Swiss-Prot record:
Active site: 233 (phosphocysteine intermediate)
Stretches assigned to the Tyrosine-protein phosphatase domain: 26-292
Protein name: Probable tyrosine phosphatase protein N1
Keywords of the record: Hydrolase, Protein phosphatase
E.C. no: 3.1.3.48
Source organism of the structure: Microplitis demolitor bracovirus (isolate Webb)
UniProt keyword Kinase, yes or no: no
């Protein structure tokens, strides 16, 4: 029986859990407790007949924190399958959404524009292994070319292929005001469809890159409050939920030296329907935590060695 799985624990205590017998079984029992946690949310907007065609899959979208679009170009619909999700001590850090469809491409860019977003994280290829569409090609792959939607022109400025992701700089222009903004589009390429990230260390490094550039972007635009990061995969729940959970845990670990996996999973599920919905989703998080803890202890060890060296130098000088 798992006891107090929703309590926050010290990083060292979480680290020691790896030595427990039947560790995967314990994790699955924890996930079962997360799933059983009641939450009285509604999803009426996602099931309206006029909105169902905007849902890529038959997945609900919470009403209480959904992204509400402003009308434009004669459209009266304010619906997009997207929710605001909090980071660690960072309200509305993310906008989690599904992979855009051709029909919802303008809505996707409207959400980006209206929320002043400067970073998009894409965790899926556009096509599956059998050629099925997982995500519409909502930007141009060619530099100095663009796509045009009802409200926006999206130009591809440049593309840089990195070992684990592709960084594309985009320029979005509002067709009415003619105002433009730059968007950094990060497509992570080391997460195969229906599998786990190829390398947990690379995945964590990718998340750190996103966080660093979000802060830089806020400084460039002199924003007091950083704008949300748009995160999507294909269904907008599985990979995106894991991405946000690891990001939250990384920041909690660095800032508080504590871990609360069950609480994190519970909160994400209350803000984005169907996230971390299977025991395997929950289990995927565990190796990532161990890598985080390992890296943290390496950093602390380096700092400790450095401090000891400085103390010895002072003694010699005196």
């Amino acid at each position: 029986m798992v006891v107090n799985c929703f309590e926050t624990c010290r990083a060292i205590d979480f680290w020691n859990r790896r030595n427990q017998l039947n560790f995967p079984g314990i994790v699955r029992l924890e996930h079962h407790q997360v799933i059983l946690k009641p939450f009285n949310g509604t999803w009426e907007n996602s099931e309206k007949p006029e909105n169902q065609r905007k849902n890529r899959y038959n997945i609900r979208c919470w009403d209480h924190n959904r992204v509400i679009l402003k009308s434009g170009s004669g459209s009266t619909s304010n619906y997009i399958h997207a929710n605001y999700v909090d980071g660690f001590e960072d309200d509305k850090k993310f906008i989690i959404t599904q992979g855009p469809m051709e029909e919802t491409c303008n809505d996707f860019w409207k959400a980006v524009w209206q929320n002043n977003c400067s970073i998009i994280v894409m965790l899926t290829p556009t096509k599956g292994t059998n050629g099925e569409e997982l995500c519409y090609q909502y930007w141009s792959l060619n530099e100095d070319s663009n796509i045009i939607t009802e409200d926006f022109v999206i130009e591809t400025v440049n593309t840089s292929v990195r070992p684990t992701y592709i960084l594309t700089t985009l320029r979005i222009t509002d067709k009415i005001s003619n105002d433009s903004r730059r968007i950094s589009h990060y497509q992570y390429t080391e997460w195969p469809v229906d599998e786990t990230p190829t390398n947990h260390v690379d995945f964590i490094k990718f998340i750190k890159i996103i966080n660093i550039n979000r802060k830089k972007s806020g400084s460039n635009y002199q924003q007091q409050l950083l704008s949300p990061i748009v995160v999507h995969c294909s269904d907008g729940v599985k990979k995106t939920g894991i991405f946000c959970a690891v990001d939250i845990s990384l920041n909690q670990l660095v800032l508080r030296k504590t871990v609360s996996l069950a609480k994190t999973a519970e909160k994400i599920r209350q803000q984005r329907h169907s996230t971390i919905s299977t025991p395997d989703d929950y289990l995927i998080l565990q190796p990532g935590y161990y890598v985080l803890l390992y890296l943290l202890y390496k950093i602390l060890a380096i700092i400790k060695i450095k401090n000891c060296g400085e103390k010895k130098s002072r003694r010699k000088s005196t």
